[in-house]
Each structure stands twice: as C-alpha cells, then as structure tokens.
C-alpha cells in the first residue's frame, strides 16, 4: 500500500484529491500548518484572474455598455416596427385613394377633384420618405443582430480570460471550501510534532482556573465556559460566543449543586465533567437541564492533593476528550503514584479500560490526549516542552522533545480540543490557545 507522509506544510508525496480539467484546478492533500490550520495544495490555472484584473474590469465595462446598447436598440426596434406598420397602412390607403380618384374622375366636380388632387400631390413626397424609413428599419434590425453577436463573442472572451462575476466567483470559493473540508476530513489523526506560539485570548480571573468549548458541538455552536479557581467553586459562566467571552458580555451563570476540585474539567456533548471536591467522584452536569445526570466514584483514584500535578491545586483528577472519546487521567496507590489513563463511558461514567503509563504524576506539569495518545509536559518549568508520550493503542511509550512557549510562567490547565485541533490553557490568569501540528500517514484511496 502506497502511503504519503506529511508534516507541517511539507509534502513528501502527492495525492490528487480533486481535479477539474475544464477549469485547470488540481487539489492535493497536505498536513496542518504551524498555525494549526489544515493546508491543501491547490494548483490553479496558468491564466490567473489576478494578473488580468485591469483588462477584466475593462471587459466587464464594455459588456455592460454593449448590453445597454442592445437593450436600447430592442426598444427602438419595437417602436419602429409599430410606426412602420402604421406608415405602411397609410401608404396602402394613399394608393387606394389615388386609384379611386382616377376612377371617379368624371363623377365629381372639377373644383372638388382639383382639391383632392392637390392634397394627393402634397402627400406624394412621403413615398420616398417611407422607402428611406423602411431601409432604416432594415439597418436597425441588422445592427441589432450584430450587437447580439458581439455580446456573445465578449461573453466567450470573458469566460476564456477568467473574468468571472461575483456570483460565479462566490460559487467557486464555496466549491473550494468544500474540497478543503474533505481534505481536512481525510487527514484525521496524527502524531504531535509541533506546538505554535501562544495566542492570548483574554486576561481574566485568578491565577488558577479553566475555560473550554464543547468538543462535540456543531461548528455553529461557539459557546465558551469559564470556571475561575481550583477548589470549592460552583459558579460556571457560559458565554454565547468566543467574541462575547473576549468582551465579557452575553453570558449566563450555572450554579453547580456540588463544588469542584482542580482545573481538569471538560465539556463534552452538552455536559460538564468534573471532580467533586474532597472526593474521587466524577460528576456529569447537563447544562440545558441544569441538573446532574450521573455521578460515580473512580475506583482507587487519589484526591484532595494526594496525587496532583507538580503545581498542586487539587489536580488529582484530569478529564480529557479527544477524537475517540472521554478519558480520565489520575493516580492510585496501587499504581504507586504513576499516571493511570482510563477510557470512560460518557453515559454511565464506568471505566471501559485502563492503562498504567509508568510515569510519576507528581513529575508532570500537565497532560493532554490526542488520538488516543497521552502527552505529558513539564509546563511547570521555564523551558516548557512535551517530553513524554504514552500510546494506548500499543500500550507503549516514548520520550519526545516538542518545545512550546510558557509565556506567563504558570500553566494550571492544559487541554486539547479535537474539534478545533488546539490546546486550551489557563496561564497565570490568562486564557491562551496553542495550535498544534500533527504528523499524518495517509493511505491513498484505491490502494490495497
């Protein structure tokens, strides 16, 4: 099976996902850029609209003028046609009258006949005008056909040059967005190879706390939840959007029936999962109904600062969500203080499976899950980096060296959001985001 290895924005192989011969578009798979965005290589036609903006604008203006002239000529032709019909009927009437006068030459008085004859003599010059009018009408019809042909030729030139109108460009952009979305879906899971520079969203609250979005919500749902402090807190603020969170507006308050401990909370599919204060109980609180749906003890889990992260703060239990579901990271006496990773059933909170990583929890600054891999940091130190990874699919580990900038020197919450492929952190009263770069292995469609 042929595989494409990709990391960052470098492509070591090429796989055409989409191709449009008539437009010249080709779209290739790629990986995430350092800022965390999915990047796909698009090969565009050689004749780019950007290089022809001036001529395209002139062409559009010329087409508009031709269309205006064409419309004016159509109106003129319609009016001319009506006038021509009237003149032709008058011509017929004149000839009929002239014939009748000639036939009635002997039956009318000389005076009356002379008067009618003089009137007919006055009308005779109109015959030549009528002939010219008919000739002009034929010219108008011919010109209208030429303008119509010119308009068609200009439209063909416009299409060849790529001078598309706004609606056409909008449709093309939407189609390309759909292609890029399919590219992102194809990338899927990967191994962490880089963490971006920090992006400070806001400075709010005390030194310790947590903030998060729902990892299972649709893209249109951008609510943000904010929980200040690391023990005995009960107040959760829900902001309508990230913009509202930045401005500190449009929020509602939830008052939890039981206080929390630590900062390892997570929002998953409309519910908050947190550690009940002074216990090893996991609580699932549903925001919409404002009620606790289920709570359950985590067997043997330490609590009340028995096995916290190196920074303390009642961080005995840390809940996480990645592409595969809900996880709990904690420690038991049976595991001698080493980190235990457990997969939880989000409905019942029962442990589905557990792994002993062999890594002492008190030596870790923070941890997060990506694609079933637990990444451990020394974020309590100045030269912060991700330096340990445990793979649940193979029950194996390795030491890594992925540095990142600990801008405010005290990270008390670090969690991965698979929907946004970003790390949410609370750093010394600052709410901060990091984008991640993943190393992908993509199987070519159709390969065995």
Curated annotation (Swiss-Prot):
Residues 52-79, 130-187 form a coiled coil. The keyword Magnesium does not apply. Disruption phenotype: No gross abnormalities with normal lifespan but mutants display reduced exploration, locomotion and olfactory sensitivity, reduced amplitude of the first negative wave in the visual evoked potential test, abnormal motor coordination, anxiety-related behavior and changes in AMPAR complex composition. It comes from Mus musculus. The gene is Olfm2. SMART domains: OLF. Glycans are attached at residues 68, 149, 269, 304, 393, 435. Residues 188-440 form the Olfactomedin-like domain. PROSITE patterns: OLF. Residues 1-14 form the signal peptide. Peripherally associated with AMPAR complex. AMPAR complex consists of an inner core made of 4 pore-forming GluA/GRIA proteins (GRIA1, GRIA2, GRIA3 and GRIA4) and 4 major auxiliary subunits arranged in a twofold symmetry. One of the two pairs of distinct binding sites is occupied either by CNIH2, CNIH3 or CACNG2, CACNG3. The other harbors CACNG2, CACNG3, CACNG4, CACNG8 or GSG1L. This inner core of AMPAR complex is complemented by outer core constituents binding directly to the GluA/GRIA proteins at sites distinct from the interaction sites of the inner core constituents. InterPro entries: Noelin_dom (IPR022082), Olfac-like_dom (IPR003112), Olfactomedin-like_domain (IPR050605). Expressed in the brain (at protein level). In the developing eye, first detected at 12 dpc in the retinal pigmented epithelium and preferentially expressed in differentiating retinal ganglion cells between 15 and 18 dpc. In the brain, expression is detected mainly in the olfactory bulb, cortex, piriform cortex, olfactory trabeculae, and inferior and superior colliculus. In the adult eye, expression is detected mainly in retinal ganglion cells. Expressed in carotid arteries. Involved in transforming growth factor beta (TGF-beta)-induced smooth muscle differentiation. TGF-beta induces expression and nuclear translocation of OLFM2 where it binds to SRF, causing its dissociation from the transcriptional repressor HEY2/HERP1 and facilitating binding of SRF to target genes. Plays a role in AMPAR complex organization. Is a regulator of vascular smooth-muscle cell (SMC) phenotypic switching, that acts by promoting RUNX2 and inhibiting MYOCD binding to SRF. GO terms for biological process: locomotory behavior; neurotransmitter receptor localization to postsynaptic specialization membrane; positive regulation of smooth muscle cell differentiation; protein secretion; regulation of vascular associated smooth muscle cell dedifferentiation; visual perception. Keywords: Coiled coil, Cytoplasm, Disulfide bond, Glycoprotein, Membrane, Nucleus, Secreted, Signal, Synapse. Its main location: secreted. It is found in: Secreted; Synapse; Membrane; Nucleus. This is Noelin-2.
């Amino acid at each position: 099976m042929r595989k494409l290895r990709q990391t960052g924005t470098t492509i070591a192989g090429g796989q055409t996902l989409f191709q449009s011969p008539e437009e010249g578009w080709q779209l290739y798979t790629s990986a995430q850029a350092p800022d965390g965005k999915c990047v796909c290589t698009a090969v565009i036609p050689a004749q780019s609209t950007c290089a022809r903006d001036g001529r395209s604008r002139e062409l559009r203006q010329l087409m508009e003028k031709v269309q205006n002239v064409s419309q004016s000529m159509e109106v003129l032709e319609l009016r001319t046609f009506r006038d021509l019909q009237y003149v032709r009927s008058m011509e017929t009437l004149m000839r009929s009258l002239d014939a009748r006068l000639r036939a009635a030459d002997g039956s009318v008085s000389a005076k009356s006949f002379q008067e009618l004859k003089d009137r007919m003599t006055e009308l005779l010059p109109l015959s030549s005008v009528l002939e010219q009018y008919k000739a002009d009408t034929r010219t108008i019809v011919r010109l209208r056909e030429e303008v119509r042909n010119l308009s068609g030729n200009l439209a063909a030139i416009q299409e060849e040059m790529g001078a598309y109108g706004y609606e056409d460009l909008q449709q093309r952009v939407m189609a390309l967005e759909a292609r890029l979305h399919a590219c992102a879906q194809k990338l899927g899971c990967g191994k962490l190879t880089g963490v971006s520079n920090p992006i400070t969203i806001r400075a709010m609250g005390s030194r310790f706390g947590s903030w998060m979005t729902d990892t299972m919500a649709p893209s249109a749902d951008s609510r943000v939840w904010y929980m200040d402090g690391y023990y005995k807190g009960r107040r959760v603020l829900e902001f309508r959007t990230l913009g509202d969170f930045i401005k500190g507006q449009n929020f509602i308050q939830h008052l939890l029936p039981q206080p929390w401990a630590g900062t390892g909370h997570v929002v998953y599919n409309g519910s908050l999962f947190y550690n009940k204060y002074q216990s090893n109980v996991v609580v699932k609180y549903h925001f919409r109904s404002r009620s606790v749906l289920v709570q359950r003890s985590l067997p043997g889990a330490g609590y009340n600062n028995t096995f916290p992260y190196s920074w303390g703060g009642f961080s005995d239990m840390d809940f996480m969500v990645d592409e595969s579901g809900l996880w709990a990271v904690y420690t038991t006496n049976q595991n001698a203080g080493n980190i235990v990773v457990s997969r939880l059933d989000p409905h019942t909170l029962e442990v589905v499976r557990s792994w002993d990583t062999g890594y002492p929890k008190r030596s870790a600054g923070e941890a997060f899950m990506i694609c079933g891999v637990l990444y451990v940091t020394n974020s309590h130190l100045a030269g912060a980096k991700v330096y340990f990874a445990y793979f649940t699919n193979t029950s194996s580990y390795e030491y890594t060296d992925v540095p990142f900038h600990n801008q405010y020197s005290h990270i008390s919450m670090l969690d991965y959001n698979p929907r946004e492929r970003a790390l949410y952190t609370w750093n010394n009263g600052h709410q901060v985001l990091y984008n991640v770069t993943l190393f992908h292995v993509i199987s070519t469609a159709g390969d065995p």
